[in-house]
Amino acid sequence: HVVDIENLIGPDHRGATVDQIQAVLAEYRELVGAKEDDLFFYGANPGLRVQVMLATGSNQVRGYKGKDGADRALLDVVGSDWVVGQFDRVCVASGDHAFAPLARSLKGEGLHVTVVSRPMSVSAELYTAASEHLVLGEGLAAA
């Protein structure tokens, strides 16, 4: 799981609390059917990293300062060469176009790529690169 937490929370991510992060991640986990032993990498700006670590209990929280810092950090950690051969499915929790080349590469290698975004918040490039697209807030409404 490649989780751009800022993208999942939305425009008000700067003031996100541990409870808010846990709530959006619980919805994400249910939506994609995440298992307890799944591998997660989280991306967040340096100002949000501590809250994400507390919310997840994970030290796999990456982020750089500056524009698209969380995206760039996640892409540096999760390259297609490392993923191919170890996994058969990758979930990208973001709508950002920056993840489209990774999704396209993984899908081209035969992996199932699930993209999860907020409603109306996925780039066309990432949408077409994915095997499937799930939307937070819509998948659980019918449950």
Label each region the model flagged.
Residues 1-73, 107, 112, 120:
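Domain-level signal for Mg2+-assisted phosphodiester chemistry and nucleotide/NA-binding surfaces
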Residues 48-50, 99-102, 123-124:
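Short, well-ordered alpha-helical microsegments
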Residues 74-80:
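Acidic, metal-associated active-site segment
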Residues 83-88:
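Glycine-rich phosphate-binding loop signature in dinucleotide/nucleotide-binding domains
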Residues 110-143:
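Acidic, PIN/NYN-like endoribonuclease modules and their adjacent C-terminal/linker elements
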Residues 4, 78, 92, 96, ...:
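A residue-level signal for conserved active-site and pocket-lining positions in enzyme catalytic cores
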Residues 77, 101-106:
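A short acidic, amphipathic alpha-helical/loop segment
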Residues 41-43, 89-95, 102, 116:
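Acidic beta-strand-to-loop metal/phosphate-binding motif
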